[in-house]
Amino acid sequence: VRFMTMIKMDETALSSETPPGVYEAMGAFAQEGRVNGTLVELGGLMPSSAGAIVSLANGRIKAVDGPFAEARELVGGYAVIDVRSREEAVELGRRLMQIHLDNWPGWEGSCEIRQIAGS
């Protein structure tokens, strides 16, 4: 079953320097997932200043360039995983949060886990 995990964090954390330990631990996590077949794709996202939002409201399509001042939390990274169950997906989400806890003092955020339709 495939799931998308989305690491959500405050925009200021996205704009600050990520400690090297996070990259090292994420690299090990990614390598393990590639070897055991659970990791499909993994990536980090740039701050919202490098993005845009395209929306549809009241019959009109509008594009707004970042940064997104009204957003409290933004997705800073993601992983697509292929696991046997929702419980296994949650366990991998816990591991992603543990990487941040162990390597980024003061970091706060969440890992949203959503099953991919049709998987």
Language-model segments: residues:
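Conserved, structured core segments of small domains
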Residues: 1-119
